[in-house]
C-alpha cells in the first residue's frame, strides 16, 4: 500500500476541487495512483450530482450584471440557506449573470450549454454540486437590451430588480428599483395586470360582497370598486413612492422628466413549494437503512 502524503492530497484537491477527505479516500482506493484517483473522484462527484438532482431547491441567490446597453438578473437555487451564502455558489451566480448579458442565451437550456471556465456552465454547476453536496440549479433570468438606461437593485441576495428607464437623473432609476423591491408590483400599469390575477381578485371580491346582503346593483359596484383598488395597489405607476408617499411613482417620474419602460422582479424561491421534513421519520428511515447494510 502506497503512503498517501499531504502533498498528494493537496495536488488532487487542486485538480478536482473536491473536499480533502474525498481526495484522501480516492488516493487510498487508487493506491496512490494520481490519475486513477482523479478518475475515481470524477465518477464519485458525478454520482453526487445525479443523486442531488431530485432534491428541491427553494433557497438561493439573485445576481445582476449591467454592461453598456444590456443588463440581466438571474436566480440560482440551492437546498439550504447555509449554501446560499457559500462564496463559490455566489461567485458562480455572478459569472452566470455576466454570461447572460454578454452571450444573450435564448433560455436556461441554452445558457447551461455556454462555455465557462474551460468547460460549460452546466458542467461547472455539476462540479459545484459534487463539491458542496447540494442540488444547485439555474432557475430563470431576465435580460434587457436597450438604448435607454438600466438600473439594478439587489436587496441582499434574495430580491433582485432590473429596470429600464429614461431620464437624466440616474438616482431615479435606483429609487424606482428599490421601490419595486419593497412594494413588489406585478405590472407597470393597471392595464398590464395579468387577467388571471384580476379574475382571482374579482372572485374574492364577489364572495365578500355577496355576504353583505345588499342589492345586486350595490354588490356589483362594490366588486368593481374592490377590483379597481387592487389594480392601483399592484401596478407600479399607481403605487405611492416609498421615499415620499405623498407622490405616486407616476407623479415622481413626471416631476423628474423620466419614465419607466420595463422592469423585472425576482424573489428567491417564489412559487417553489419547499420540502417539509419530518425529522423523526427521516432519522428512523436512516436507522432502518443502516440495519439492512
UniProtKB/Swiss-Prot annotation:
Pfam families associated with the record: EF_TS
This protein's UniProt keywords: Cytoplasm, Elongation factor, Protein biosynthesis
Stored CDD domains: UBA_EF-Ts
Region (Involved in Mg(2+) ion dislocation from EF-Tu): 80-83
Gene3D superfamilies the UniProt entry points to: 1.10.286.20, DNA helicase RuvA subunit, C-terminal domain, Elongation factor Ts, dimerisation domain
Any one annotated GO CC term: cytoplasm
Chief localisation class: cytoplasm
Cited InterPro entries: EF-Ts_dimer_sf, Transl_elong_EFTs/EF1B, Transl_elong_EFTs/EF1B_dimer, Transl_elong_Ts_CS, UBA-like_sf
Highest taxon above the source species: Bacteria
SUPFAM superfamilies: Elongation factor Ts (EF-Ts), dimerisation domain, UBA-like
GO molecular function: translation elongation factor activity
Location(s), subcellular: Cytoplasm
Entries under PANTHER family matching the protein: ELONGATION FACTOR TS, ELONGATION FACTOR TS, MITOCHONDRIAL
NCBIfam families recorded: tsf
Its job: Associates with the EF-Tu.GDP complex and induces the exchange of GDP to GTP. It remains bound to the aminoacyl-tRNA.EF-Tu.GTP complex up to the GTP hydrolysis stage on the ribosome.
Family listed: Belongs to the EF-Ts family.
Record-given protein name: Elongation factor Ts
Source taxonomy: Bacteria, Pseudomonadati, Pseudomonadota, Betaproteobacteria, Burkholderiales
Gene it is expressed from: tsf
Amino acid at each position: 500500500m502506497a503512503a498517501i502524503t499531504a502533498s498528494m492530497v493537496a495536488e488532487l484537491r487542486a485538480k478536482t476541487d473536491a473536499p480533502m477527505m474525498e481526495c484522501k479516500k480516492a488516493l487510498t482506493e487508487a493506491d496512490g495512483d494520481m490519475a486513477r484517483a482523479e478518475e475515481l473522484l470524477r465518477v464519485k462527484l458525478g454520482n453526487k450530482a445525479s443523486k442531488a438532482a431530485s432534491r428541491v431547491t427553494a433557497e438561493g441567490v439573485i445576481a445582476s450584471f449591467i454592461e453598456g446597453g444590456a443588463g440581466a438578473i438571474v436566480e440560482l437555487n440551492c437546498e439550504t440557506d447555509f449554501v446560499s451564502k457559500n462564496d463559490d455558489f455566489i461567485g458562480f451566480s455572478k459569472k452566470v449573470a455576466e454570461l447572460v448579458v454578454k452571450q444573450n442565451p435564448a433560455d436556461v437550456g441554452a445558457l447551461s450549454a455556454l462555455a465557462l471556465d474551460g468547460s460549460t456552465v452546466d458542467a461547472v454547476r455539476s462540479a459545484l454540486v459534487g463539491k458542496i453536496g447540494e442540488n444547485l440549479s439555474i432557475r430563470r433570468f431576465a435580460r434587457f437590451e436597450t438604448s435607454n438606461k438600466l438600473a439594478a437593485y439587489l436587496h441582499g441576495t434574495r430580491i433582485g430588480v432590473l429596470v429600464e428607464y429614461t431620464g437624466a437623473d440616474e438616482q431615479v432609476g435606483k429609487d424606482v428599483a428599490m421601490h419595486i423591491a419593497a412594494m413588489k408590483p406585478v405590472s407597470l400599469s393597471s392595464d398590464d395586470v395579468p387577467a388571471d390575477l384580476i379574475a382571482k381578485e374579482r372572485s374574492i371580491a364577489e364572495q365578500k360582497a355577496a355576504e353583505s346582503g345588499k342589492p345586486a346593483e350595490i354588490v356589483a359596484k362594490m366588486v368593481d370598486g374592490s377590483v379597481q383598488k387592487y389594480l392601483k395597489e399592484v401596478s407600479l405607476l399607481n403605487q405611492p413612492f416609498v421615499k415620499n408617499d405623498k407622490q405616486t411613482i407616476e407623479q415622481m417620474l413626471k416631476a423628474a422628466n423620466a419614465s419607466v419602460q420595463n422592469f423585472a422582479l425576482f424573489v428567491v424561491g417564489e412559487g417553489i413549494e419547499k420540502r417539509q421534513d419530518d425529522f423523526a421519520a427521516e432519522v428512523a428511515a436512516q436507522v432502518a437503512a443502516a440495519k439492512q447494510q
